[in-house]
Amino acid sequence: MQSIAKTFSLILALQTSGYDHTFSKVGMEPTGDRFDSILQLELKDWRPFNPMINAGAIVTADCIKAAEPFEEFLALVRKLCANPNIKLNEKVYQSEKRTGTRNRSIAYLLKSDHVLDGEPEEVLDVYFRMCSVMCTAKDLAHYAMILSNKGVDPKTGERLLDADIV
């Protein structure tokens, strides 16, 4: 799933922490920098520019208020993709965890600037797991169909997401 996980993480952060809290921690502005850049964090503002860059996605992972954030994330992915068999790829997760030094740097910088509420290693564990979920193009097409239909599954007619979150 890698970076597509960022969209699910944002949805879950909005559902569990609310709009105001989530966007007090991460902005909504585009950036012309690389997805893993920290340049703007130091130059412009203490908040990541948006939830679709690594710094922003780490923050949205921290904004998920649940006893088991990754389990909540996985349940949401399964629901929105209409596939109860979606799961974590343990090898990808271990690789992300082992090689995620830049993301570690970002998380500790965010913690030092009081953007992260949680402990960096705990937040990163959730983030690395999110990025390591395996799904198919068909799964993601179903998810896109729900987003394009303002949160309603057109196959079942069931509202799966509030329209204002979409």
Features from the language model and the residues they span:
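Electropositive phosphate-/nucleotide-binding environments in soluble metabolic enzymes
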Residues: 54, 100, 134-137, 163
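Short N-terminal secondary-structure initiator segments
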Residues: 6, 66, 158-159
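A penicillin-recognizing enzyme superfamily signal
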Residues: 133, 153-166
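Active-site-adjacent helix/loop patches that line small-molecule binding or acyl-intermediate pockets
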Residues: 13-130, 146
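Active-site-proximal alpha-helical segments within enzyme catalytic domains
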Residues: 134-152
